[in-house]
Amino acid sequence: MSDILEKIGAYKLDEIAAAKRARPLASVEEMARAAGSVRGFASALRARVDTGAYALIAEIKKASPSKGLIRADFDPPALARAYQAGGATCLSILTDGPSFQGAPDYLSDARAAVSLPVLRKDFMYDTYQVAEARAMGADAILIIMAAVSDAQAREIEEAAFGWKMDVLVEVHDEEELARAVELKSPLLGINNRNLKTFETTLATTERLAPLVPSGRLLVGESGIFAPDDLTRLSKVGVRTFLVGESLMRQTDVEAATRALLAPPA
């Protein structure tokens, strides 16, 4: 595990312990049951791809450990509406505070502003966080294989399925991919960013995509900035993309989203 993930993991475990003391699991589960119906995340992506179009998971992200502040003018509901109007299929919303300046309210407020399914983008180590995610209104959660053991991954996935949520399983190399395909989720994200060095290359997806068993919905993550990047990754079977930073830096997020998804002339 990389230094950054070790650092994040350490404070996350402290956060989880503090959250459990402040709000017992039974209380969080009660909130989760009252959160309303789940919007189908994976089904929305599949339906979009089945039309022959690209499916975009558009990310609402204020900052990151590697880039610092990404967007000062940060209004999650307005950004969610812009993404929806621009053609996004789903949203990904950062809820991690220390590293990404995210917050649970960002997810709840953004989801309330649109009809799109929403992923809680955070570092998941405990099934308590899954109930938390549903209580926030999340429709899907992320499992980063570099951050968890196989047993943790299975427990978190089963907890998500128990809440009828979808799971995006993220990998960066062959070893993580081999572990990920043992899980049940059809959503498999290939992160082009190396979490050890933070270097980013689309060649990661090009290398790993051919190794993925059929039936999985591949998601290209990180390093995607232009329509040419989508075209490049589509050549190895990727038609669903998670894009955040490049869109967050634009003045007109709706127009930038539409331009990214525009079919080649």
Curated annotation (Swiss-Prot):
Keywords: Amino-acid biosynthesis, Aromatic amino acid biosynthesis, Decarboxylase, Lyase, Tryptophan biosynthesis
Pathway per the UniProt entry: Amino-acid biosynthesis; L-tryptophan biosynthesis; L-tryptophan from chorismate: step 4/5
One example of a Gene Ontology biological process annotation: L-tryptophan biosynthetic process
InterPro entries from the UniProt entry: Aldolase_TIM, Indole-3-glycerol_P_synth, Indole-3-glycerol_P_synth_dom, Indole-3-GlycerolPSynthase_CS, RibuloseP-bd_barrel
Keyword field contains Coiled coil: no
Coiled-coil ranges from the UniProt annotation: none
Enzyme Commission code: 4.1.1.48
Highest taxon, organism lineage: Bacteria
GO molecular function: indole-3-glycerol-phosphate synthase activity; phosphoribosylanthranilate isomerase activity
CDD domains, alphabetized: IGPS (cd00331)
Catalytic activity: 1-(2-carboxyphenylamino)-1-deoxy-D-ribulose 5-phosphate + H(+) = (1S,2R)-1-C-(indol-3-yl)glycerol 3-phosphate + CO2 + H2O
Enzyme class label: lyase
Family per similarity comment: Belongs to the TrpC family.
Protein name: Indole-3-glycerol phosphate synthase
Taxonomic source organism: Parvibaculum lavamentivorans (strain DS-1 / DSM 13023 / NCIMB 13966)
Lineage of the species this protein comes from: Bacteria, Pseudomonadati, Pseudomonadota, Alphaproteobacteria, Hyphomicrobiales
Gene field: trpC
